[in-house]
Design a protein with these regions (language model features):
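N-terminal structured subdomain of primase-like DNA metabolism proteins
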Residues: 1-99
Length: 99
C-alpha cells in the first residue's frame, strides 16, 4: 500500500488535559453542587427540575440525571449536550483543541 499524500492533514489536536476541572466547570455553568462523597447533586439543566436529580462526579466529570436519564462521562459530553454542539465545537469552546 502506498502512502497517499493527498490525505487530509488535521490542523487541530484534541488534548483532554486542557479541559476545565469538573468542579469549576459545573459551577461556572450555574449548578449549585450539594452533597458529600464521590457524587454531588444539582438540579438538572436538561429538563424542568425542582429537586436535585442530577448526579456529578467531580473527579472524572461524569454525570447522570436520575429523572430524565441524560448522562455522559466528562465535562466535554456535558457541554456538547447542554449547548447542542458537536465534538469539535465543544472542544474548541472549552479550550481543549491545540490549533
Amino acid at each position: 500500500m502506498k502512502f497517499n499524500s493527498n490525505r487530509r492533514k488535521y490542523k487541530s489536536i484534541f488534548n483532554r488535559n486542557l479541559l476545565p476541572r469538573p468542579g469549576e466547570y459545573y459551577r461556572k455553568q450555574g449548578l449549585k453542587l450539594t452533597g458529600g462523597g464521590e457524587w454531588k447533586s444539582a438540579t438538572c439543566p436538561f429538563h424542568e427540575d425542582k429537586n436535585p436529580s442530577l448526579r456529578l462526579r467531580l473527579d472524572s466529570g461524569g454525570f447522570r440525571c436520575m429523572a430524565c436519564g441524560v448522562h455522559g462521562g466528562d465535562v466535554l459530553a456535558f457541554h456538547m449536550q447542554l449547548h447542542n454542539l458537536n465534538f469539535i465545537s465543544a472542544a474548541r469552546a472549552l479550550g481543549a483543541l491545540e490549533e
